[in-house]
C-alpha cells in the first residue's frame, strides 16, 4: 500500500518572506531497512521503569526471560560500595540502602535540556545527583571507590539495552547486533536520536525506531489479517510516558491516523502523589520531615509502588515500612478511593490526548472498533473506568499483555526489517505519522509550517524563502515543533546559518528549505541558495542536546570498561565460590562425614587446621582479586588432596584426588 509520490506547489507571502511550497510524500515502502548485516534482529521495549526483549521465531513471538526468570526487567542501574555494577532487579532491590548510587528514570532525562522544566522538577524528586554538563542533564555517581563519573542518560540507557542484548544472546545462543527499539510516539527528534545513540553505545545497530503504540497495535493485529478493516485506539500509559494512537488496520496494513500524548505522565507520577501523602502524614504524626531523607524516601517509594499495584485488585492495603527513620515504623492504611482522590487530576489528564487524537483522526467514538491497553498503569481501575465512560461503556480488548505488548510488536517489526518474514508477517506494512507540527521561524517570529502533525512518514516537504533585507548575505534557519502560531510558544529543535548568498534586493534570492522525516521519525533540514548552489544540511536533534561522534566514542569506551569490570567481578565471584565450595566440602567430609572415622589423628588435625585457616582467610579477604582466590584454593588443595587421597586408598575407595571437596562439587555450584 505504498503511497505514490505527489508534488503540490503553492505561492504565498510570509510577512516579508516570499515562499513557494513544494510538497512531496515519499513511498512508504522505500524505507524498508536495508539491514545492518546478518543475524537475528531482536525487538526491545526500553521503558522508563521496566524493559522487555522479544524475538520472532518459528512463526511466533517469544518474550525472553532474564537470568532471574522474569520477562520484564527494571530499567535500574546501581554501583555498589565494592565497585560492582548492578542492572535490573539486583539494582532495584538494593536501592533503599544505596540511593545516591542507584540510577533510574533515565528515559525521563534522555534527549532533554538541563534547563527543561520537566528535568528541573524531576531533579527535586530523584535521590541521585543530576548536574549540568554542556546544557544536558548528567547523573553524578561514584562508580567505584573515589571514581566519580558524570553519566549521560544515553549511557545509563545503554547499560539497560546492553542487558537486554545479553539476555537475548543467552537465549538464542548467538551474538546479537541488530534491534528494533521502541520510543513513545510523542518523543521529539532529540529524544529519538538520543535513544539511537544509547543503542549504539550498547553495541546495537538500530534497524528501526518504532513508536510504542504502533508496536502494541502490531501485537494486537498479528494473526487477525482476515478479520476485515478495524479502527483501533491504543491507550499506552506506562511508568513515565503516555501515548494515544488511532490506527486503521486492514489486511496487514497498519496506518496511524493520529497520535497524541504526554512524555512526562505515568505510573511514577501516581507513586509520587502517594509518597507526598505519606510524607505529610509522617510530618503531622511524628513532627519529622523526611522529604530530604533519601534512604527513607527510597523505602517509602518501593512500598508505595507495591501498594499502587495491589489497589488494582484490592480495595484497601496497608502501607508498611519497617524503621522508616530513627527506628520509627510506618504502618498506615490506604484505600483505593484515597488513591484515586490523590491522583484524580492526573487520571483525568489522560483523557485530553484521547480527545485530541480522535479529533485529528476525524473519527467519532462509535467508529472505534477496539481499545487496546498498553503499560502497567492501564491496570488501574479508575483509568479503565474513565476510558470506558468516554467510549460509552465499550470494554477494552483483553487479549494483549500490557507489560509485554510493546516488545511483542517490536519483535514483529524486527522480523519484518530483518527480511526473515513468514506468511504471518510478510504482508504487514506500518505507516506511522509525525506527532507534532514541524516548521521554521519567519519574520516577526511567525511559525511557518512545513510538515503538519500526523503527516505520514517518511516524508519530505520543501518551501522557498527569500531575504528580508537588501544585500543580505546570510540567513538563519530556526527549526521548531509545536502547534502554536508564534515560535516563542513552540519548542526550538535546532538552528543553522546559510552564508554566501549573493547580495541582491530583498525578496530576490530564492532559498529552498527542505524538511525530511525518515521512518524513525528523525528530522533532517537542508537549505540551498538556488543562485549560488551553496547549501547546508543538519539532522535535527537539538544542538545543545546532540551527542557528538566524539562523545559516543568516549561512551563506547566507558561501556567496554564497565563490561570488563563486570567480567572481573563475575570471575572474582566465581573464584571465591570455588574456594568456599571446596572448603565446605572438605569440612563436611572430615567433620561427621564418611571420612571422619577413616582418618588418623594427625591427618584429621592437619586438614582441620587448613580448613580453619581458610575460613579465617575468607573472612578477612572479602574483595581480593580472582588470582588470590585461585592461589588460596591451590594452597588448600596441596594440603588436603594428598591426605584425602591416601584415606580413600586405605579404605578401598577409588575417588581421585580432591573429591572430598571435590572439583565436581564446586563445578556444579
Swiss-Prot record:
Glycosylated sites: 423
Subcellular location: Endoplasmic reticulum
Keywords attached to this entry: ATP-binding, Chaperone, Endoplasmic reticulum, Glycoprotein, Nucleotide-binding, Signal, Stress response
GO biological process: chaperone cofactor-dependent protein refolding; endoplasmic reticulum unfolded protein response; ERAD pathway; protein refolding
Pfam families, A to Z: HSP70
Signal sequence extent: 1-32
UniProt feature, compositional bias: Acidic residues: 660-669
Record's keyword annotation contains GTP-binding: no
Described function: Functions as a chaperone during endoplasmic reticulum (ER) stress response.
Family: Belongs to the heat shock protein 70 family.
The protein's name in its UniProt record: Heat shock 70 kDa protein BIP3
Source organism: Oryza sativa subsp. japonica
Amino acid at each position: 500500500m505504498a503511497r505514490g509520490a505527489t508534488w503540490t506547489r503553492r505561492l504565498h507571502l510570509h510577512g516579508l518572506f516570499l515562499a513557494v511550497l513544494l510538497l512531496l510524500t515519499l513511498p512508504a515502502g522505500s524505507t524498508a531497512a536495508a539491514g545492518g548485516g546478518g543475524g537475528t534482529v531482536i525487538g526491545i521495549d526500553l521503558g522508563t521503569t521496566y524493559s522487555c526483549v522479544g524475538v520472532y521465531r518459528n512463526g511466533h513471538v517469544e518474550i525472553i526471560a532474564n537470568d532471574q526468570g522474569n520477562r520484564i526487567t527494571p530499567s535500574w542501574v546501581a554501583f555498589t560500595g565494592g565497585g560492582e555494577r548492578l542492572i535490573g532487579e539486583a539494582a532495584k532491590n538494593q536501592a533503599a540502602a544505596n540511593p545516591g548510587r542507584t540510577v533510574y528514570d533515565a528515559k525521563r532525562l534522555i534527549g532533554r535540556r538541563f534547563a527543561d522544566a520537566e528535568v528541573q522538577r524531576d531533579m527535586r524528586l530523584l535521590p541521585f545527583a543530576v548536574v549540568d554538563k554542556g546544557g544536558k542533564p548528567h547523573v553524578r555517581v561514584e562508580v567505584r571507590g573515589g571514581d566519580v563519573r558524570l553519566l549521560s542518560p544515553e549511557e545509563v540507557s545503554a547499560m539497560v539495552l546492553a542487558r537486554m542484548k545479553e539476555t537475548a544472546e543467552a537465549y538464542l545462543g548467538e551474538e546479537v547486533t541488530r534491534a528494533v527499539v521502541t520510543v513513545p510516539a510523542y518523543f521529539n527528534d532529540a529524544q529519538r536520536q538520543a535513544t539511537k545513540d544509547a543503542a549504539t553505545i550498547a553495541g546495537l545497530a538500530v534497524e528501526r525506531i518504532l513508536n510504542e503504540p504502533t508496536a502494541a497495535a502490531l501485537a494486537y493485529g498479528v494473526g487477525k489479517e482476515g478479520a476485515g478493516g478495524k479502527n483501533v485506539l491504543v491507550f499506552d500509559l506506562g511508568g513515565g510516558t503516555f501515548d494515544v494512537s488511532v490506527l486503521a488496520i486492514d489486511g496487514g496494513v497498519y496506518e496511524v491516523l493520529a497520535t497524541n500524548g504526554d512524555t512526562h505522565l505515568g505510573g511514577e507520577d501516581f507513586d509520587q502523589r502517594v509518597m507526598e501523602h505519606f510524607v505529610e502524614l509522617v510530618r503531622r504524626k511524628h513532627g519529622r520531615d523526611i522529604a530530604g531523607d533519601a534512604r527513607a524516601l527510597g523505602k517509602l517509594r518501593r512500598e508505595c509502588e507495591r501498594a499502587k499495584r495491589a489497589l488494582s485488585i484490592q480495595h484497601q492495603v496497608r502501607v508498611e515500612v519497617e524503621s522508616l527513620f530513627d527506628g520509627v515504623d510506618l504502618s498506615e492504611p490506604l484505600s483505593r478511593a484515597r488513591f484515586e482522590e490523590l491522583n484524580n487530576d492526573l487520571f483525568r489528564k489522560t483523557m485530553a490526548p484521547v480527545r485530541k487524537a480522535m479529533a485529528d483522526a476525524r473519527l467519532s467514538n462509535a467508529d472505534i472498533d477496539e481499545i487496546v491497553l498498553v503499560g502497567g498503569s492501564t491496570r488501574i481501575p479508575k483509568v479503565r473506568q474513565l476510558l470506558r465512560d468516554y467510549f460509552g461503556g465499550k470494554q477494552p480488548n483483553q487479549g494483549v499483555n500490557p507489560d509485554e505488548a510493546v516488545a511483542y510488536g517490536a519483535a514483529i517489526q524486527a522480523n519484518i526489517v530483518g527480511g526473515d518474514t513468514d506468511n504471518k508477517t510478510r504482508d504487514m506494512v506500518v505507516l506511522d505519522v509525525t506527532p507534532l507540527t514541524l516548521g521554521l521561524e519567519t519574520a516577526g517570529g511567525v511559525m511557518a509550517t512545513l510538515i503538519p502533525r500526523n503527516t505520514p512518514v517518511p516524508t519530505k516537504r520543501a518551501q522557498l524563502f527569500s531575504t528580508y533585507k537588501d544585500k543580505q548575505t546570510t540567513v538563519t534557519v530556526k527549526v521548531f515543533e509545536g502547534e502554536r502560531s508564534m515560535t516563542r510558544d513552540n519548542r526550538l529543535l535546532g538552528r543553522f546559518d546559510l552564508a554566501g548568498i549573493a547580495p541582491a534586493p530583498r525578496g530576490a534570492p530564492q532559498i529552498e528549505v527542505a524538511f525530511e522525516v525518515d521512518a524513525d521519525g528523525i528530522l533532517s533540514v537542508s537549505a540551498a541558495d538556488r543562485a549560488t548552489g551553496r547549501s547546508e544540511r543538519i539532522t535535527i536533534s537539538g544542538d545543545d542536546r546532540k551527542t557528538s561522534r566524539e562523545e559516543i566514542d568516549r561512551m563506547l569506551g566507558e561501556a567496554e570498561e564497565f563490561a570488563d569490570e563486570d567480567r572481573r567481578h563475575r570471575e572474582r565471584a566465581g573464584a571465591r565460590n570455588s574456594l568456599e565450595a571446596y572448603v565446605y566440602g572438605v569440612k563436611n567430609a572430615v567433620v561427621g562425614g564418611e571420612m571422619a572415622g577413616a582418618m588418623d589423628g594427625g591427618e584429621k588435625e592437619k586438614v582441620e587446621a587448613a580448613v580453619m585457616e581458610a575460613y579465617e582467610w575468607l573472612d578477612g579477604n572479602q574483595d581480593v582479586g580472582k588470582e588470590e582466590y585461585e592461589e588460596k584454593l591451590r594452597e588448600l588443595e596441596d594440603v588436603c588432596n594428598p591426605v584425602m587421597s591416601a584415606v580413600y586408598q586405605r579404605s578401598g575407595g577409588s575417588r581421585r584426588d580432591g573429591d572430598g571437596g571435590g572439583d565436581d562439587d564446586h563445578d556444579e555450584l
